[in-house]
């Protein structure tokens, strides 16, 4: 333990000095990187039962996270629970108004904003109720008894929120296996957060992706029709969700909720088609707004969106065929905005 404490201290000094240049200016990424994590607990198993697993945490993390959350009840968390709960929490952090996010296998399957947190949950769940079953649910505000009553009416694996009323906690006890996590207060961080991904023999180290609100500070409208204020609001919601969906990502939204999510397809037009398929049995895609995490390389994605009843699109822009894509949008009286920022997620 003594060596461990000393090594952590030395690592902190090394990392700090590593980002200082000769002129004392700072470079975000050091030449040598030393990471220090402490084992929180062993897991029943890893991603699959034949794999061993443990959860290691950064004790210095101040950002609200699954790592510094408190488990109020339920079975022990699995590796997949932690991974999905992290994705769910990071997505719900994107929203300032009351919001609910439901995640299944590391992809959002339903997201909604509403003045009523209960209605936000119902709207998110009903986007794709089949996928929501057995999923992870996160809220960005206090869970009261009405929400708790709705939660225990179905099966979910993990519930995440910054706080719970005493009545809600009592109601949730009706599902003793439900893992209930309370996070620290969700507030904007001033930390310089970094993102780490592992590959065999190394790690990839980068800035954490930016918040989605910043992308809408400046945007261009290349189409003949400009989006309405309502469309802009809906496009922003879709964009926030799209940033947290595995690429290629397409999100359809309407009335402050997602209506169809096309995740993880190997080409963009299939993601558009999948989002439409997902919407068919529930909310439908008519009069929806579409977000795409990267540019459309061809007009086929726009043509498919038109068939789905999409009225407005947000995308980064920047394709060599942008003019072709803009023409397709104009032919279908769609409004389209270019934000100039891509949000790939792998």
Predicted regions and their residues:
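ATP-dependent carboxylate/acyl-activation modules
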Residues: 9-13, 19-346
């Amino acid at each position: 333990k003594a060596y461990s404490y000393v090594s952590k201290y030395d690592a902190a000094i090394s990392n700090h000095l590593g980002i200082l240049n000769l002129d004392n200016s700072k470079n975000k990424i050091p030449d040598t990187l030393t990471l220090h994590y402490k084992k929180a607990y062993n897991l029943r198993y890893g991603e699959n039962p034949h794999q061993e697993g443990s959860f290691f945490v950064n004790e210095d993390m101040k950002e609200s996270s699954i790592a510094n959350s408190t488990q109020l009840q339920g079975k022990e968390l699995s590796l997949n629970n932690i991974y999905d709960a992290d994705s769910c929490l990071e997505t719900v952090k994107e929203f300032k108004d009351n919001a609910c996010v439901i995640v299944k296998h590391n992809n959002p399957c339903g997201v909604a904003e509403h003045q009523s947190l209960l209605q936000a949950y119902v709207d998110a769940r009903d986007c794709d109720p089949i996928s929501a079953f057995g999923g992870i649910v996160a809220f960005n505000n206090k869970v009261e008894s009405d929400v708790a009553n709705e939660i225990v009416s179905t099966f979910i694996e993990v519930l995440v929120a910054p706080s719970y009323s005493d009545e809600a906690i009592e109601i949730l006890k009706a599902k003793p296996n439900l893992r209930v996590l309370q996070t620290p207060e969700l507030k904007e961080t001033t930390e310089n957060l970094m993102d780490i991904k592992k590959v065999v023999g190394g790690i990839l180290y980068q800035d954490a992706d930016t918040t989605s609100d910043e992308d809408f500070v400046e945007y261009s409208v290349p189409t003949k029709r400009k989006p309405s204020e309502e469309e802009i609001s809906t496009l922003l919601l879709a964009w926030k969700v799209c940033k947290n969906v595995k690429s290629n990502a397409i999100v359809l939204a309407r009335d402050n909720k997602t209506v169809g999510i096309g995740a993880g397809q190997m080409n963009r037009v299939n993601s558009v088609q999948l989002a439409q398929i997902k919407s068919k049995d529930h909310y439908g895609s008519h009069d929806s707004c579409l977000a795409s995490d990267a540019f459309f390389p061809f007009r086929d994605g726009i043509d498919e969106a038109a068939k789905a009843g999409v009225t407005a699109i947000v995308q980064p822009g920047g394709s060599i065929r942008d003019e072709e894509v803009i023409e397709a949008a104009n032919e279908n009286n769609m409004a389209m905005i270019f934000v100039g920022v891509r949000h790939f997620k792998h």
